């Protein structure tokens, strides 16, 4: 039996998740040489995506949401890239690299029903596989589908993106530049400002920890903004509402500033009346909605793959290595301590 390092969910956090209290790495025995379920596979998990939505799954089973809660005592789950090492499936063969939602652990034994949720990675441009967890994965599809479906960009407009250096924000900004928009990004430190402007081509960026957000928007967009792509919620959303032009669009992708707060601490946006006076469209979404990810998936994969290959779109992935770093990597992602898409490398791509 192999001692399989796994990221275990222990308790619904109060505030920020606490390593070894709310979640932690434990070894669980697994027989990777034993019988395989009919139609199933055994996977070696190579990479896992660390995303804000996982914080929302760290909750009690009595709390409803769009995604199911993690089960206390079981491994947490995420989008993984894995290599098939043994197979009893007609769909997947040993050596195939696949992606899907699976447990965060070194090896996984999947039943036939779970295998149906995994897809073989097609990689004609031979891109680094971790990119399939970023711009070519769920965050990329989130950015692409919502930018076009809800944002409805028009050349010459102004877009403001919060959490602009993150997995979703960095792609939205680059898509907006391709469409001829004036692109503004807010981030949490000066290094990230330099990254989005000099590295990604944003027209301007600002550090929200150094400037009052509303004053910064007045400075960089004195005539207002047409699209706000919201990744943080709270006071930033309130400030963006003041800056919106008539008939502007607000794409609500996430509210990471609110995820670790108690109900009494949540920020109450005070100027929602401006949605009426300025005829603003404000819309949230889930990437699996039929008019979002499924509608755009083929187009997204085709276009973004090509743009990464030809160098016109620049992905930024931050990779931490080793299951022992899983808890800290997750906290770093939630607190925005690193630049780019957060990925944990669980194992080497080769070998058993």
UniProtKB/Swiss-Prot annotation:
EC assignment: 1.-.-.-
Family: Belongs to the NADP-dependent oxidoreductase L4BD family.
This protein's name: NADP-dependent oxidoreductase RED1
Disruption phenotype: Significantly reduces the production of T-toxin and decreases the virulence to maize.
InterPro entries: ADH-like_C, ADH_N_2, GroES-like_sf, MDR_fam, NAD(P)-bd_dom_sf, PKS_ER
Source species of the chain: Cochliobolus heterostrophus (strain C4 / ATCC 48331 / race T)
Coiled-coil residue windows: none
Classification via Gene3D superfamilies: Medium-chain alcohol dehydrogenases, catalytic domain, NAD(P)-binding Rossmann-like Domain
């Amino acid at each position: 039996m192999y001692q399989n390092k796994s990221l275990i969910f222990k308790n619904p956090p109060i505030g920020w998740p606490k390593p070894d209290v709310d979640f932690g790495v434990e070894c669980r025995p697994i027989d990777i040489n034993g019988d395989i379920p009919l139609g199933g596979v055994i996977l070696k998990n190579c990479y896992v995506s660390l995303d804000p939505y996982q914080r929302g799954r760290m909750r009690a089973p009595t709390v409803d949401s769009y995604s199911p809660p993690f089960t206390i005592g079981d491994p947490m789950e995420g989008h993984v890239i894995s290599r098939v090492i043994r197979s009893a499936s007609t769909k997947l063969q040993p050596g195939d690299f696949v992606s899907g939602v699976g447990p965060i652990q070194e090896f996984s034994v999947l039943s036939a029903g779970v295998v149906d949720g995994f897809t073989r990675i097609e990689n004609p441009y031979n891109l680094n596989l971790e990119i399939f967890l970023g711009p070519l994965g769920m965050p990329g599809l989130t950015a692409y589908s919502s930018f076009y479906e809800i944002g409805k960009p028009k050349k010459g407009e102004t877009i403001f993106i919060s959490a602009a250096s993150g997995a979703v924000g960095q792609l939205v900004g680059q898509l907006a530049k391709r469409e001829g928009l004036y692109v503004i990004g807010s981030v949490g430190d000066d290094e990230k400002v330099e990254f989005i402007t000099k590295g990604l081509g944003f027209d301007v960026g600002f550090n929200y920890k150094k400037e009052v957000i509303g004053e910064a928007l007045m400075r960089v967009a004195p005539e207002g903004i047409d699209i706000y792509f919201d990744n943080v919620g709270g006071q930033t959303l309130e400030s963006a509402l003041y800056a919106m032009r008539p008939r502007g669009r607000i794409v609500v992708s996430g509210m990471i500033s609110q995820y670790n707060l108690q109900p009494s601490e949540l920020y109450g946006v005070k100027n929602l009346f401006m949605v009426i006076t300025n005829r603003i469209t404000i819309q949230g979404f889930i990437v699996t909605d039929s008019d979002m990810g499924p509608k755009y998936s083929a187009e997204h994969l085709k276009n973004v793959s090509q743009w990464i290959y030809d160098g016109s779109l620049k992905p930024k992935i931050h990779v931490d290595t080793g299951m022992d770093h899983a808890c800290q990597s997750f906290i770093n992602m939630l607190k925005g301590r690193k630049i780019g898409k957060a990925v944990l490398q669980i194992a080497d791509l080769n070998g058993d």
